[in-house]
Regions:
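Short amphipathic recognition helices of helix-turn-helix/homeodomain-type DNA-binding modules
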Residues: 64-75
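DNA major-groove recognition helix of helix-turn-helix/homeodomain DNA-binding modules
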Residues: 46-65
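Recognition helix of helix-turn-helix/homeodomain-like DNA-binding domains
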Residues: 31-46
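The alpha-helix within a helix-turn-helix
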Residues: 16, 27, 54-55
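Helix-turn-helix DNA-binding elements, focusing on the entry/boundary residues of the two helices
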Residues: 12, 23, 34, 51
Length: 75
């Protein structure tokens, strides 16, 4: 299943919030600005290095590609 950058960003944000992280946490760990993280989570930035942060913090790739994110961010 192919998802849009916007949907990918929304799922990453949902995962981040569910885990209790803030955009400032992602920014500090990746070296990117909060504005870059916000752009990623709204689909305006497709930086794969930012995406790696979510995987490094436990998000499973399956969550990005399942239909409608039906299992939620806990998978």
């Amino acid at each position: 299943m192919i998802i849009s950058l916007r949907e990918m960003g929304q799922r990453c944000k949902k995962y981040r919030v569910h885990r209790g992280y803030y955009q400032t946490d992602v920014a500090a760990d990746t070296g990117y600005s909060v504005e870059n993280i916000s752009s990623f989570e709204t689909g305006r930035n497709d930086n794969s290095r930012i995406l790696l942060w979510y995987f490094e913090h436990g998000m499973k790739p399956e969550y990005l590609f399942e239909r409608n994110g039906e299992h939620g961010p806990e998978i």
